[in-house]
């Protein structure tokens, strides 16, 4: 029996509909490539991108190529009212970290810095205030770095511990050639990282812990932040799990020392 395509569109309209679908698909793919992939790479930069950064700026610490199960934990914006809780988590799990100190938060917390050093933690320089370091003049940034350096040195002297190599992490994480040159002249190594849960902006501690664990790789440098209530539960989740997976969680200096060939 013959079939009559009573509801079939004329061929001209079918071609037009097909072109419309193809165009819509093209727009979708373009949007994914233009917006979604770059956003995802910012949130979770792939290994090849971190490796490119390390080659492009070899004077900056991003990660350390190694097959050893070892990562550096770095914690910005210390000290705060949460620092001692963070210290307790690290001690309970046989872990250590490099804390990047904001000088404006130190007054009244000098004993906390001393305790951190005595417990095997490391202190890095994060300037005096929580602001983009790149926007400061050379003289202002130099003054801030040296002021924080004095505070850090006093903590090591009080703890009776030798001062380790000097690390600087710029406020907001951005740098340029001028900042890199200035930091080097002051005897510092610029330290960034490869695993960053964006915890200043994202307060969901379970999500942040999962982010860290999903990005975990030998030689990684984790960046997270003190001064937030959600950091403590995030580390309570992430640090024991890293240890369970066989990773050592150490300071920047220990990572560089133990992976040196």
Walk through the language-model features, giving the residues of each:
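N-terminal pre-catalytic segment of deacetylase/amide-hydrolase enzymes
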Residues: 2-73, 79-92, 238-241, 245-261
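Active-site beta->alpha N-cap acidic-glycine motif
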Residues: 47-136, 140, 144-157, 163-165, ...
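Structural detector of well-ordered beta-strand residues that form the stable sheet scaffold
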Residues: 72, 98-100, 124, 169, ...
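Non-membrane alpha-helical structural segments and their capping/turn regions in soluble enzymes
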Residues: 138-143, 206, 229-232
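Basic- and aromatic-lined ligand-binding clefts that recognize polyanionic substrates
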Residues: 155-176, 180-183
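His/Asp/Glu-enriched short active-site or ligand-binding loop at hydrolase and phosphoryl-transfer sites
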Residues: 174, 179-215, 247-258
């Amino acid at each position: 029996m013959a079939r009559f395509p009573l509801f079939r569109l004329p061929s001209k309209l079918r071609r037009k509909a097909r072109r419309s679908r193809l165009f819509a698909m093209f727009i979708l793919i373009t949007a994914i490539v233009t917006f979604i992939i770059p956003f995802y790479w910012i949130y979770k930069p792939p290994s090849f991108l971190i490796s490119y950064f390390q080659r492009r700026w070899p004077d900056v610490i991003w990660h350390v190529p190694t097959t050893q199960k070892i990562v550096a934990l770095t914690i910005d914006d210390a000290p705060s009212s949460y620092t001692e809780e963070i210290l307790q988590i690290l001690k309970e799990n046989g872990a250590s970290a490099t804390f990047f100190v904001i000088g404006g938060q130190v007054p009244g917390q000098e004993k906390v810095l001393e305790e951190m050093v005595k417990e095997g933690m490391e202190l890095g320089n994060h300037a005096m205030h929580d602001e983009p370091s790149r926007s400061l003049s050379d003289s202002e940034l130099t003054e801030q770095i040296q002021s924080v350096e004095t505070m850090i040195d006093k903590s090591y002297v009080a703890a009776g511990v030798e001062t380790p190599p000097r690390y600087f992490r710029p406020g907001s994480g951005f740098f340029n050639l001028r900042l890199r040159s200035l930091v080097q002249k002051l005897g510092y190594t610029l330290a960034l990282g490869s695993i960053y849960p964006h915890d200043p902006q994202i307060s969901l501690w379970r999500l942040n812990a999962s982010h860290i664990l999903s990005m975990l790789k030998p030689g990684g440098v984790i960046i997270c932040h003190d001064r937030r209530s959600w950091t403590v539960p995030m580390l309570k989740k992430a640090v024991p799990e890293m240890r369970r997976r066989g990773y050592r969680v150490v300071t920047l200096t220990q990572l560089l020392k133990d992976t040196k060939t």
